[in-house]
């Protein structure tokens, strides 16, 4: 089922909008984490058009510079490696869409006693088009490794990007590059981390020209790759998937994806009879670039949050009513959402939403005020 181009809005949740910043040129990623170990979720903002990496301190959203002189930043991941309560930050920078011009530096940033002051930047690797970083508990011990998913292979060229793209990881300490897989071809845009089979070990889902793929480490440290879904069935390079998230409706797991690369579709996958069935629930996005799942109402059913960068620049929320997915507009034209993060930002027990805009240069958070009362609909 595909929603019409302008589906009827169904207001399910209420929000209060807050603007934090309006000068983040090329806003690309927002990460929610407790940067200063005070129990409140702060926001780290990465803007590819800036050379400063900044964070905003909850609750007043005071701005702090983590590090300067970091050109062409593209992605970060935060995790407390040493157990001092303050996360280290893995950062990919010196990025270019042209693989032969992309240095692909990966650095680890660590505070120097006060997270509000300058952090130390230590380079650990150079891998062309390093594009997505995530901390992953592959061993099931709570000690995470850093996964690096480059966008393309080193010799890839637009528009087909026909080259093998590596997927690698690093263990804190030696930071040696280790191969997960280097046989997949094309472009990989997004990865997400999940304990796919409930064994206490994290797995990796990737979204790219080859669709949605699952990477799982097996005995002896060998990695296995399996295809979950092919994504958009169009011909290469319009095929596959761009970003993927995992959600649940009760006990049932589903996947939500932006498709194809930077695409116009929100697709939902449900494993009916063990086979993942694709349903396009919206085909009206323009340059779709972010997708997340979150239980906004606390009812055990996850909503989907999706945003797109092209005009008319909107962020949508999709809620499942038992028969179909209904759409609500969270932001109409106020942010060209390159990324959204979900976290409880005001400590009221409800998850909120934060988004960063590329062309709009802004950072907003949307305070979750709870579901709309039935009498208001």
Where are the language model's segments positioned?
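Beta-propeller-forming repeat regions
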Residues: 1-377
